[in-house]
Regions:
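Alpha-helix N-cap/helix-start positions at coil->helix boundaries
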Residues: 18-22, 34, 49-50, 65, ...
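Acidic (E/D-rich), amphipathic helical modules within compact regulatory domains
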Residues: 48-61, 73, 79-82
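HEAT-repeat alpha-solenoid elements in large eukaryotic scaffold proteins
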Residues: 14-18, 45, 84-88
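Eukaryotic acidic, Ser/Thr-rich intrinsically disordered low-complexity regions
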Residues: 150-186
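Alpha-solenoid HEAT/ARM repeat scaffold
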Residues: 10, 22-23, 38, 53, ...
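Amphipathic alpha-helical scaffolding segments comprising HEAT/armadillo-like alpha-solenoid repeats
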Residues: 2-14, 33-45, 64-76, 96-115, ...
Length: 186
């Protein structure tokens, strides 16, 4: 199956670190759904950052209440690609619905920290999306977005922060909808 010697979920998780096999392994793990979650969670501790990144991407679709804490912890990973995937998974409601949408008590502090201080502009841009989920209900989130919009060294982060900050188009849409709306611009 899939040209792999072993096809158990643990072996497929390790294949996420192999550029030749990552796509097929990802698709197969995703198709296994809940049956793969345990192996995916274990993969968050793999030495290979590509495996950790792939596991965060999978948890974007497969996260459950038991794995949410581990996904939040991945926002502090030393590899920027892993942090980006973790922030996307935490911010994106489109892929998982509202069943596991994390509340501000679990995710806002790490998102605020990375928005203000992460050295990678792509990580800060993804942190904008997570902070933006709470800009209508938390003054700290709104203030952090305004600060980022005005002062972030990256023009792309400043622009994105403006979309999510009070007065921005995504913020305006969120004011008209529940706080757990999808983060993707329409």
């Amino acid at each position: 199956m899939l040209g792999f010697v072993r096809t158990d979920s643990e072996a497929l998780v390790s294949c996420l670190g192999d550029p030749q096999r990552t796509t097929a392994a990802y698709r197969e793990l995703l198709s296994r759904g809940d049956r793969a979650v345990s192996a995916v969670r274990a993969g968050l501790r793999d030495a290979n950052p590509a495996v950790r990144e792939g596991c965060c991407r999978l948890l974007d679709h497969l996260v459950d209440t038991d794995s949410m804490g581990e996904l939040v912890a991945m926002a502090g990973d030393p590899d920027a690609r892993v942090r980006i995937a973790a922030f996307h998974a935490l911010a994106c409601d489109r892929c998982k619905g509202d069943t596991c949408a994390p509340g501000p008590d679990r995710v806002l502090e790490p998102a605020l920290h990375h928005l203000a201080a992460d050295p990678d502009p792509h990580v800060r841009a993804m942190a904008v999306e997570l902070v933006g989920k709470f800009a209508c209900s938390d003054a700290r989130a709104a203030a952090a977005l305004r600060e980022s919009q005005a002062n972030d060294p990256s023009p792309a982060v400043r622009k994105k922060a403006g979309w999510y900050a009070p007065g921005g188009p995504i913020h305006a849409r969120r004011q008209r909808r529940p706080a757990t709306s999808a983060h993707h611009p329409e």
